[in-house]
UniProtKB/Swiss-Prot annotation:
This is Protease HtpX. It is an enzyme of class 3 (hydrolase). It comes from Shewanella loihica (strain ATCC BAA-1088 / PV-4). The gene is htpX. GO terms for biological process: proteolysis. The keyword Isomerase does not apply. One of its GO terms (molecular function) is zinc ion binding. It comes from the Bacteria. The keyword Zinc applies. Its cofactor is Zn(2+). The active site is at residue 140. Binds 1 zinc ion per subunit. The lineage of its organism: Bacteria, Pseudomonadati, Pseudomonadota, Gammaproteobacteria, Alteromonadales.
Length: 287
């Protein structure tokens, strides 16, 4: 209950702040053009702010320890492997980090190809063979080389804009309909209007999540193919097969999960950021 209240309160606060900022900027959100500007600024603004702080957030939320000086042979091999693959892919050497988790997973993040982070879990580092780990690292380096972080940020910005714009257009239509059937012509009123906007934000947000998840799944297949080029198809398949045999991964912050090697299973495949591992293995074998 507390979480729901905080979610509603946060949404209301964002709307209030957004309205104040738009008023200061002189943008009239009562017109379609003004509303579209409002939606684009906050839709893309939020997405790009998330991208800009993605490395910092990853280090804080996942407890990533960046390897500056390798402490043992395993860490040295890890850094050397990422360096070799980054050179093959034609990108600047990413920061390499380890985070403490028993699950088999890894992720890449960062605002650009030349400012990125590749992190692996301790469970993966000490629970997989070097060939399998090399396949995982190649997948993550491929994400960076393909510019997937920026691509998904742009997609997220577009769908955010759609959600903000569409929710308020539909809410205005409902408000006008209520006003036309009300003797006093008052419409929904401020609080009812904000409640309708909140519900529509949630509904359109679910649709938007499906769209982003679809593009994420497409990028996963491409990262697998890129990983196969960097490490070899057999190592990429071996890595995915090992992940398929392992336990289901736990929760990971959405921005990191989108570029993880192993996605969380979902009853609705439409909401999955990663295709099923079986399909990914089949796609690699078919190449």
């Amino acid at each position: 209950m507390k979480r729901i209240f905080l979610l509603i309160a946060t949404n209301m606060a964002i709307l209030l702040v957004a309205s104040i900022v738009m008023s200061i900027l002189g943008v009239n959100t009562s017109t379609m053009g003004g509303l579209l500007v409002f939606a684009a600024i906050f839709g893309f603004g939020g997405a790009f702010i998330s991208l800009a702080i993605s490395k910092w957030m990853a280090k804080k939320t996942m407890g990533c320890e960046v390897i500056t000086t390798p402490r043992d042979n395993m860490e040295r091999w890890l850094v050397d492997t990422v360096a070799r693959q980054a050179e093959q892919a034609g990108i600047k050497m990413p920061e390499v980090a380890i985070y403490q988790s028993p699950e088999l997973n890894a992720f890449a993040t960062g605002p650009s190809k030349d400012n990125s982070l590749v992190a692996v879990s301790s469970g993966l580092l000490y629970g997989m063979t070097q060939d399998e780990i090399e396949g995982v690292l190649a997948h993550e380096v491929s994400h960076v080389a393909n510019g997937d972080m920026v691509t998904l940020t742009l997609i997220q910005g577009v769908v955010n804009t759609f959600v903000i714009f569409a929710a308020r257009v539909v809410a205005s239509i409902i408000d006008n309909f209520v006003a036309s059937n009300d003797e006093e012509g008052e419409g929904l009123g401020m609080f009812a209007y904000m409640a309708v906007v909140f519900v529509l934000d949630m509904l359109f947000g679910i649709l938007a999540s499906m769209i982003v998840a679809y593009f994420s799944r497409v990028r996963e297949f491409k990262a697998d193919a890129g990983g196969a080029q960097l490490a070899g198809k057999h190592k990429m398949i071996a890595a995915l097969d090992r992940l398929r045999q392992g336990p289901e991964t736990g929760a990971m912050p959405a921005q990191m999960a989108a570029f993880g090697i192993n996605g969380k299973k979902s009853m609705a495949e439409l909401m999955m950021s990663h295709p099923p591992l079986e399909k990914r293995i089949e796609a690699l074998r078919a190449q």
